[in-house]
Amino acid sequence: MVIYDSSKKEYCSLEPLKNRHIKVYVCGPTVYDDAHLGHARSAIAFDLLRRTLNALGYKTTFMKNFTDIDDKIIKKMNETGKSLQEITSYYIQRYLEDMEALGVQRADIEPKATQNLDAMIDMIERLLQKECAYQTPNGDIYFDTSKDEKYCTLSHKCDEESMSRIEPNPDKKNPADFALWKRCKGEGDVCFDSPFGKGRPGWHIECSAMIDKHLAYHDTPFQIDIHAGGADLLFPHHENEAAQTRCACNQELAKYWMHNGFVTISGEKMSKSLGNSFFIKDALKVYDGEILRFYLLSTHYRSDLNFNEEDLLASKKRLDKLYRLKKRVYGVQASTPQKEFVDELLQALSQDLNISKTLAAIDQFIAYANEHLDNNPKDKAFKKQIVANIEYISKLLGIGHKDAYSYFHLGISEEEKQKIEELIEKRTTAKKEKNFQLADSIREELRSMGIAIMDTPQGTLWEKI
């Protein structure tokens, strides 16, 4: 498999550190609010990576963290009067619900920052002993970036514009130095005991320490195979992670670095701090999770995606075609997927998750299958292979797994379904009584409601247009 390494800025052949086992770490959410479509995009992108690696025969260990202590969480506590545990457990559960709705597989390891303070304190102590960190007069502990000769070689973003994102502090030795431990500020703060005094960890140390504790190899030049996350995390977060690990553990953090593009609205990056978030939960009230997944999946993971309803509906129509084919082979048992088709999909995804080629291959399969069924409606062996191919698509991309008829009823309330069924029953009675004028009138009434009907040997079927 070939992937694009964000640090090297080139395509690399994926060579596991050990055997055919790939260890992947993806930065998870800071749980102070609901997740937005930017979080969904990242989760879906690397879920596709995981599914592809598994399909290619690699064993994977996948880890995603929860940042459950942070300035934003403390601010939320002070605003709401709720405890740290109340806020973080609530938003972790909501995040997991969102991921389930989007078809994102649970990570093998899901550590929380507050449950791994021992690992963070241990890493900070190592950095202090090596004189790669220092304590300021007010008790904060900072990483000394001047002690890492390779600092900025990951992101290549130590220019003036990038450095302007870093909060200035007169107690720091160097402008790029970053907090490892923040001294307790008193009332309203969240504090933990440590050898350095009461306080809490900085954001960057959390990921490095949890990787070192739960996922890392300690006998290889790199701790893990792939570190992944959103492009906005490359600097300073991932740069700082890499520096800490290098200095504390005498290892590089990851052999490969992968970053997904932004989700934008009118060209502006989606983030909660900008106030233009489209929360996943809000989107799920309007669109089914599978449709959202397919839409977010349909643009290559490294490209920015400008969210708009027109593209989403076009994406839905593309997914509709798969389900229409699935309806044509409803009730047929699968045989085995076509080898040439499987190879074509895996070859495309093996090229840095080339989703465009992957979906083109699926479109071609759907078109050919429909044409063959039109000409050979009784070809049972072919129908079985169609079902097998669709099942393989479902396993690989996480789409196409719903009941074909239920899919076309998505977004219809139970009350609306009851009305539709009553009209269809009324139409069936009218046809039996040869009242074709009434039957046609009911068909038009249903069409005006956005419902198309099809008369089949199994009865009248309907779907949302």
UniProtKB/Swiss-Prot annotation:
A motif ('KMSKS' region) lies at residues 269-273. Its EC number is 6.1.1.16. The keyword Metal-binding applies. It is an enzyme of class 6 (ligase). ATP binds at residue 272. SUPFAM superfamilies: Anticodon-binding domain of a subclass of class I aminoacyl-tRNA synthetases, Nucleotidylyl transferase. A motif ('HIGH' region) lies at residues 29-39. It catalyses: tRNA(Cys) + L-cysteine + ATP = L-cysteinyl-tRNA(Cys) + AMP + diphosphate. It is found in: Cytoplasm. GO terms for cellular component: cytosol. One of its GO terms (biological process) is cysteinyl-tRNA aminoacylation. Keywords: Aminoacyl-tRNA synthetase, ATP-binding, Cytoplasm, Ligase, Metal-binding, Nucleotide-binding, Protein biosynthesis, Zinc. One of its GO terms (molecular function) is zinc ion binding. Monomer. This is Cysteine--tRNA ligase.
